[in-house]
């Protein structure tokens, strides 16, 4: 639903009603629909601002709430990784995942990334199946960065690679460089109707 309104985020607020277990976007489950509607009608609750990731490839911009990924299942992806214009490493493997605080509990977590507590305006980068032996080494650990950090991936060839933007994917065939950062001009506004502990939400993941 969020991606349908990416160009209108200044005019939209999101109200979450969860039909499964309690999620990170919503405070109400389907059996609490009456309470949910009462908050909605009376404009009660507290507004929370969520960061949006911005990825730029060949002049095209892509926006994600959870994560932006570079993945190559066809062959080993070799790329130079830069943080704030400083080369961190040359990575070899399947790819890299960059996530927001909210996205840290999603694909990032399954990759062994750290879960970031709510309220922390940070981004995180983690490897996807990196190759590590005596000849090739990289950080091989989650890297948590300040929200104003800029991450760049550069390669002579992204043949076979895909750019994952939350649940959407795009080809990187003609790409040489990918830039990822927090988008200062776009935020997602979510209405919180009742106080639910972050750790109670976290426990629904396991």
PLM regions with names:
Residues 1-10, 43-45:
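N-terminal glycine-/serine-/threonine-rich phosphate-binding loop
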Residues 20-94:
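Catalytic core of DAGKc-family lipid kinases
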Residues 49-53, 64-66, 75-79, 94-96, ...:
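A generic structural signal for short beta-strands and their flanking turns/coil linkers
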Residues 89-135:
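Gly/Ser/Thr-rich active-site loops/lids in small-molecule metabolic enzymes
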């Amino acid at each position: 639903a969020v991606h349908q309104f990416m160009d209108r985020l200044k005019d939209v607020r999101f109200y979450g009603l969860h039909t499964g277990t309690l999620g990170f976007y919503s405070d109400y489950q389907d059996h609490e629909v009456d309470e949910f509607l009462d908050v909605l009608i009376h404009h009660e609750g507290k507004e929370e601002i969520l960061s949006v990731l911005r990825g730029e490839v060949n002049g095209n911009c892509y926006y994600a709430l959870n994560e932006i990924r570079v993945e190559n299942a066809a062959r080993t992806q070799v790329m130079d990784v830069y943080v704030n214009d400083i080369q961190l490493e040359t990575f070899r493997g399947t790819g890299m995942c960059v996530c927001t605080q909210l996205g840290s509990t999603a694909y990032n977590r399954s990759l062994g990334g750290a879960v970031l507590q709510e309220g922390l305006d940070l981004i995180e980068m983690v490897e996807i199946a990196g190759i590590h032996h005596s000849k090739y080494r990289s950080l091989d650990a989650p890297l948590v960065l300040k929200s104003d950090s800029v991450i760049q991936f550069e390669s002579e060839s992204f043949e076979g690679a895909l750019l994952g933007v939350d649940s959407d994917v795009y080809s990187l065939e003609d790409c040489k460089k990918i830039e990822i950062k927090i988008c200062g001009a776009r935020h997602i506004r979510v209405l919180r109707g009742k106080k639910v502990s972050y750790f109670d939400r976290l426990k629904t993941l396991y």
